[in-house]
Every structure is written in structure tokens, then in C-alpha cells.
Amino acid sequence: MTKKLYLPLLMAMVVALFSSCSKKMGELSADYFTVTPQVLEAVGGKVPATINGKFPEKYFNKKAVVEVTPVLKWNGGEAKGQPATFQGEKVEGNDQTISYKMGGSYTMKTSFDYVPEMAKSELYLEFKATIGKKVVTIPAVKIADGVISTSELVNNTLGNANPALGEDAFQRIIKEKHDANIMFLIQQANIRSSELKTAKEFNKEVANVNEAANKKISNIEVSAYASPDGGVSLNTTLAENRENNTTKLLSKDLKKAKIDAPIDAKYTAQDWEGFQELVSKSNIQDKELILRVLSMYQDPAQREQEIKNISSVYKTLADEILPQLRRSRLTLNYEIIGKSDEEIAKLASSNPSELNVEELLYAATLTNDPAKQEAIYTQATKQFPNDYRAFNNLGKLAYQAGNVDKAESYFKKAASVNASPEVNMNLGLISLIKGDKAAAETYFGKAAGTKELGESMGNLYIAQGQYERAVNSFGDSKTNSAALAQILAKDYNKAKNTLANVERPDAYTDYLMAVLGARTNNSSMVTSSLKSAVAKDPSLAKKAATDLEFAKYFTNADFMSIAK
């Protein structure tokens, strides 16, 4: 009897034991998870990842609630992503339900703010599970390595960028002209004595230009006109005679003054163009009607008749407009010849006060020595403190020397004088190199027309993770950043050409060439370029030792002898 009682009890205990075992939720294999990208990569200052996970069949307890959190771990720190929660079939809730019998799949998107320590890190999934009120331990699972941080090199390649120059407006040869008008009475071509004074003053200016050491006469133009009233035949003869008489007088005066200057003479029979210009600038009655007649009719006779039909204004035209068109215009064309490069360079160092602002700024372009350029620009700020360009250009020199704070100080001083597009672009570079992408974008928005803007926007697009857009923005620019964009966009041939032609190559030029070698399976390019990079900047050896771009070279003796 006793045995009969114990046997059912024993069976019940066995069933209960197996039942409790079925509720156990243990360790999950990494095989249940895939991560895109397989090796995490920094993009636009973030480390994004898409995780596809699976709970296997007969794993997820019907009463379980599991919170899954992506955690990126590195030596001395970690960053947690957005968790996702899943529930069993008997749980009342709003989370994704996982079948006990069939299991279930899920997708999680996560992103971490990049910090340099993440260069050598691992991505885990951590689980917080409960079955009813009982806490269940599910071990964390490593699912990916990280982080390829090549895009973050923009913070280094920015030092190789080209700040905008406040350009000089120096012109060695400046073209100038001097005009005078000899006026005629209606239907007359003789030069009146009252107009000889004008001719005399004009000739005096010609003589002054001819005698000046830094001026050279190009030619003298004589343009004679007749007003559009009267027939074409009459006005043609009239204009031609005015041109002949003016040219004769001018030639006589030039010969007397012993001035050899070419004379180019022409005449216009009916000066409709001058008529239209004077009418449009006047306040006469029915001005718009007259201008409409000129636009409607091209035949001179019809134009004249239609305008005469506007009787209310014709007298005003005859008294105020037409007399101004009966003239010969004298134009002296000449060149002002500036100082030679040798003169400017010498004065810049010996007596800069003899130079104007354009000459002084130009002097800085005559040398490639940054120290001499700095001295010239500094002198320019003293002589011309209200000109922003010298301050801006001192900032450019400081930036290219790697002194970002000094550069920013000069750019801000330049902005206080004149917040020009060049200065705004340069302040944008400063913001970008300091990690403030929003401020950089604002500054670049105020830099329209600056020729270096495309390059600067390319740097911004790299920082934002827009690599194709960056490549397009850089165009044919030959800088480290341009090559970086091309590498990130996987245009390796173009990147190689860019790196080979960088104007001011530095350690990062070589480092990028090593990365390019790794991506194109060129081991000799990797080692030779990295060796050159480390020779210029020894700190890059440590970086290369953990840079996942070189992961397959971590067991290469030649590589490790450099990256140590």
C-alpha cells in the first residue's frame, strides 16, 4: 500500500523536474547574431550598427521578459545603446512576442557617439531576463569587433586644408582714361572759340600723362556725333565734318607739343543711343512714351517723325536733350605702370611705408617663406589696421603652422574689421577642427563666392558621413581630406592620384597611403608608406598598431616592426 502511494508522487516530481528544465533560458551562441557592418565603423562621428538576432526554438519561456542592450566595450569604458524588450506568449504587454515553439527573429538598430578609445573595442549584447518574478541570468554575447575609425582622420587631415586668402587687388598696369567734349551748334561743324578752352585743357592732360614716368599713352579717340533730328544724309555729312575738324585740331596741338600718340577717329551720323540714354535719365514729360517709340521703331526717319508727333515734349527735347548730342568726344586712354616685383619686394623689407595696402599684400605673395610673409602681413596690420585681409592672412599662416588657437584669434580680429566671406569660411574651418559641425555649417553658409569653399564643404561632408557628396565638393582639390573622402567612397584610383599630388604632404598623407595599400591588398605600399608616416610623426605607430584597417597585418613582422 505504501509503495502504491509513493510511486505516483515520484512520477510527479520527475515531471516537475523536467518541466522546470524546459523553462531554463541559458547562454546564447554568437551564431544566432549577425551585425552590419561586420566590423563596426565610425561614420559622421557615430558608430552605427544593425543587429539581426534570433531566439532559437523552444528557448523563450512563455512567461519570460527579456531586455536586450547593445554595449560597446573597450579597455576602461563602455557605451550602451538603445535596449529592446521581448516577451513570451503568456506575458501581457506591448513588446515583441517570441514564440516558445518556433522561436523568433528581430532587428535592432543602434548607434554610439564615437570616442577615440573605441578604436579597439568589442560589441556585446547584454540580457536582463525575468520569468515571472524570478531573475534569470543570460550571459552577455560578443557579436562584433570595432571600430574602423578612418573617417575620424578628418580631424587630422583638416590641418592640411587650405584656408581662404584675403587676396590683394594689385595691378601692375592700370588702365585709365580722361574724357572731354567739344560741343557744336545745330547743323554746324566749325569749332567755336569758346570750345578751344576745352581742347586746350584736354591737351594739357595729354602732356601731363606723356611726361609722367609711370604713365604711358595708349591712344586718343575722337568720336564725333550729330543729333538724330534732321535727315540721315545731312547728319552723316555733319558728323563727318565734326570728326575731321576735331582731328585736325588735335593733331596740330599734339605736333606742337611734340607728343607722338595714335589717334583713332570715327563718327556717328545719328546718335540714337545717346538720345535714349539722356531721355531715360531725364524727368521730362512723356519720357516713357518716347522710350516706347524707340523700342517700337528702328527706321531713323520713322522714329524722328513719331517723336515730333509728341508735340507736348518736342520743344523740351530740342532745348534740353538734342544740344547735348552735337559733339565730338575726346578720350585719352593711358596706362598707369606700377612698381616692379623687385621694387615691391625691396620696399617691403626696407621701407614698407612707401607701399600702399595692395602693394604690401602683394609683396607677401612674392616669397614662399612663412616667416617673411608673417612679417609683411604684420606690418600691413600696423599701416592699414582697418583692412581685414592682413589679419585674415596671418590667421591662414597660423592655421597652416598647426596653431589653431592663434589662427582663430586672427580670424576673429579680421571678422571684427570686416566679416567677409573669406573670414567666415576660415572661422568655419576652425569650428570644424574643434568638432562643432553646426557652427561650421553656419559659417560656410556666409562664405559664398570663396574659391576654397568647395574644399571646406568637402571636409564638412566627411564629418557628416556624406562621402559621395564630399568627393563631388572637393572636385580636383589635391589635399589629404580630398583623398580621405575618395578612400571612404571607395574610389581608390582617384585617391592614389590625389595623395601623390598633395601640395603640402605630411605624415597623414603617408598614413592615408598606407590605408589605401591595406584596402587594395598592396602590402609593400602599406609598409613603405607607414614607415614614412611614422618617421614624420612617431605617434602614428601606436595608432597603426590598433587600427583595424591593418587587421590582417597584425601578424606581419615587417608591419609590426614599424607599429610598435
For each feature predicted by the language model, list its residue ranges:
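N-terminal targeting segments with Sec-dependent signals, encompassing both cleavable signal peptides
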Residues: T2-M513, G517-T546, K552, M560-K564
